[in-house]
A protein has these predicted regions:
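A short hydrophobic/small-residue beta-strand
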Residues: 61-62, 149
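A short, glycine/Asx- and small/polar-enriched loop/turn
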Residues: 25, 104-106, 163-168
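SAM-dependent methyltransferase
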Residues: 62-139
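Conserved SAM-binding strand-loop segment of SAM-dependent methyltransferases
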Residues: 5-21
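Short alpha-helix adjacent to the SAM-binding motif of class I
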Residues: 1-3
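A short glycine-rich, Lys/Arg-flanked "PGG" loop and its adjoining helix->strand segment in the class I
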Residues: 45-60
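C-terminal lobe and adjacent flexible extensions of AdoMet/dcAdoMet transferase-like proteins
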Residues: 129-176
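A short SAM/SAH-binding and catalytic strip from SAM-dependent methyltransferases
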Residues: 25-43
Length: 176
């Protein structure tokens, strides 16, 4: 069954700060802490303005972000070693974090080892960067860009956020 045909979903790969659509939509969903990857000044507002431009009146934006608690306490200057098995092959990840409280930027340094069929391992290194946003900053940017803040939730069950919430799930409505 082709879900794209059932739901008529058009998937596009574009920069979220300046994407273009062929009309308006009822909702925009941005997941996997993609908003945290907006690290330059003005990127957050630019993204929210672009989204607002393509939403129907009263359209929704739904997104998740890593919380300040997660940046400070979970990421911080911590290092992790993770291991898993995928399709019978071992995968190892060395993960180091460097968080700058002044800029709100966290640099992630990942070293991945994945087992090849012959038992040897391939190594891959990756660097990522995310920016911490407070709930107040997100609310302010949404309102500046023409949104009505609906709520922030902790988890998929719409629980209230608290000081130890690791991920905010946020909903806002476009005011037209």
């Amino acid at each position: 069954m082709d879900l794209n045909k059932i739901y008529e979903i058009l998937y596009l790969l574009q920069d979220m700060r300046s994407f273009e659509l062929y009309g308006t939509v009822g909702a925009v969903v941005c997941c996997l802490d993609s908003i945290n990857y907006l690290t330059e000044d003005g990127d957050l507002e630019k993204t929210f303005r672009t989204v607002h431009n393509y939403l129907d009146p009263d359209g929704l934006i739904l997104f998740d972000v890593n919380s300040p608690y997660k940046f400070r306490e979970i990421y911080g200057y911590n290092s992790y070693i993770l291991e898993d098995e995928i399709d019978g092959c071992s995968v190892y990840c060395g993960w180091q974090n460097s968080f700058d409280e002044k800029t709100g930027i966290c640099d992630f340094y990942l070293t991945l080892f994945s087992e090849n069929e012959d038992g040897t391992f391939s190594r891959c290194e990756e660097e990522q960067k995310e920016k911490m946003y407070t709930l107040e900053e997100l609310k302010g940017a949404l309102e500046t860009c023409g949104f009505e803040f609906i709520g922030a939730y902790s988890g998929y069950g719409f629980e209230a956020v608290d000081e130890k919430t690791e991920r905010y799930y946020i909903a806002a409505r476009a005011k037209k």
